[in-house]
Amino acid sequence: MQIFVKTLTGKTITLEVESSDTIDNVKSKIQDKEGIPPDQQRLIFAGKQLEDGRTLSDYNIQKESTLHLVLRLRGGIIEPSLKALASKYNCEKQICRKCYARLPPRATNCRKKKCGHTNQLRPKKKLK
């Protein structure tokens, strides 16, 4: 049977499949046509994400059904050196005791007018 896969760019891919094919198998066919690795693919049908081990018939996908292909979000572990840099940039700040403005680490007075450029600053509290 024939099914359609619509990508986020609006492109529609036509695939020849059987109802007994697994979602893994469909993702492999998409990789053959589009070059997108299966581990980055997420298939959606009727508002549900399709699980790899299940078959098309499990989701009641019939001929000429349309699946939606979205890419898995990238993310994960931040490199330790970048984490230290981000921590230094975000955590080593001064806070105005009156208006709670975030100020550079070496600031002596607040930069805001609403607190009268006070010199009552404290270091930003550390995360636990």
From Swiss-Prot:
InterPro entries found in the cross-reference section: Ribosomal_eL40_dom, Ribosomal_eL40_sf, Ubiquitin-like_dom, Ubiquitin-like_domsf, Ubiquitin_CS, Ubiquitin_dom, Ubiquitin_ubiquitin-like
Ubiquitin-like domain location: 1-76
Domain of life of the organism encoding this protein: Eukaryota
Pfam families named in the record: Ribosomal_L40e, ubiquitin
GO CC entries: cytoplasm; cytosol; cytosolic large ribosomal subunit; nucleolus; nucleus
Alphabetical list of Gene3D superfamilies matching this protein: 4.10.1060.50, Phosphatidylinositol 3-kinase Catalytic Subunit, Chain A, domain 1
PANTHER family, per the entry: UBIQUITIN
Protein name: Ubiquitin-ribosomal protein eL40B fusion protein
Source species of the chain: Schizosaccharomyces pombe (strain 972 / ATCC 24843)
Gene symbol of the encoding locus: uep1
